Amino acid sequence: MRLREFTALSSLLFSLLLLSASAEQCGSQAGGARCASGLCCSKFGWCGNTNDYCGPGNCQSQCPGGPTPPGGGDLGSIISSSMFDQMLKHRNDNACQGKGFYSYNAFINAARSFPGFGTSGDTTARKREIAAFFAQTSHETTGGWATAPDGPYAWGYCWLREQGSPGDYCTPSGQWPCAPGRKYFGRGPIQISHNYNYGPCGRAIGVDLLNNPDLVATDPVISFKSALWFWMTPQSPKPSCHDVIIGRWQPSSADRAANRLPGFGVITNIINGGLECGRGTDSRVQDRIGFYRRYCSILGVSPGDNLDCGNQRSFGNGLLVDTM
């Protein structure tokens, strides 16, 4: 009897160990978690450093970049402090809620946690990624208007917290439970919202954002990290914004049938396609494009093709369900 009990117990322990060892480690399968020690995250959610993890078509995040352009692979060789100030010219205007918050140093420090950002591909791809990232986040935080000084596209990063009277944005969840008294309205460059986004974002960057969501609006580095996390993280069936802009994403037959072709327009679709795409001309989409064209001009790169999403079918609701 005791032998049978011991055998059964051993079998149970082995099964539990096997189950724990089989849990996915990273990416969309693990709530946006990242691999340690510079490992790649495979499309199946596992960490490793071989072609099965890092190769084209096998890697979903933390993938190796393309050739490093002359001048160094670091982000500062693409966007300098003076360029940052030129792009976000009025972010420190007295009328802006975010005055003094968004800094170049905070951006660079945050980007170090996402080594593929702005460092993947050739110089054109890298510049377009910087332009696209700041265009989309500038739209989310814009304080500009049609007749604003220096034009409407010089007023990105004006706002820090969602305007109006936002609710708590709490959706019941066993995995990402809302903390008592906390609200998960839009904050930071990408205006991240909802507990089911704050939770995995915090887990990925190593901060408890479910209990401390306002860190996104009080710590500039965490604020930029929240936007970069969204940018770099795919959420099936959507690719990551990063993979689209550097040319890694290749549309499926279903994507092509939906007119989702590589370019800036697909990124808008990823972010807020449920509300903005497939509707013909949309002022919000045009605002995003306006920022993108301006930033491409400052960085000295062409914007590429397929900037609009007016004729694209939506992927569905974006991670950011309510955006400007």
Curated annotation (Swiss-Prot):
Reaction catalysis annotation: Random endo-hydrolysis of N-acetyl-beta-D-glucosaminide (1->4)-beta-linkages in chitin and chitodextrins
Keyword annotations of the record: Carbohydrate metabolism, Chitin degradation, Chitin-binding, Disulfide bond, Glycosidase, Hydrolase, Hydroxylation, Hypersensitive response, Pathogenesis-related protein, Plant defense, Polysaccharide degradation, Signal, Vacuole
Modification(s) after translation: The 4-hydroxyproline residues are not glycosylated in this plant vacuolar protein.
Induction text: By ethylene.
Modified positions (4-hydroxyproline) in chain numbering: P67, P69
Signal peptide: 1-23
Main location: other
Localisation: Vacuole
Superkingdom of the source species: Eukaryota
GO molecular function, one term: endochitinase activity
EC number, as in UniProt: 3.2.1.14
Similarity comment text for this entry: Belongs to the glycosyl hydrolase 19 family. Chitinase class I subfamily.
Function according to Swiss-Prot or TrEMBL: Defense against chitin-containing fungal pathogens.
Descriptive protein name: Endochitinase B
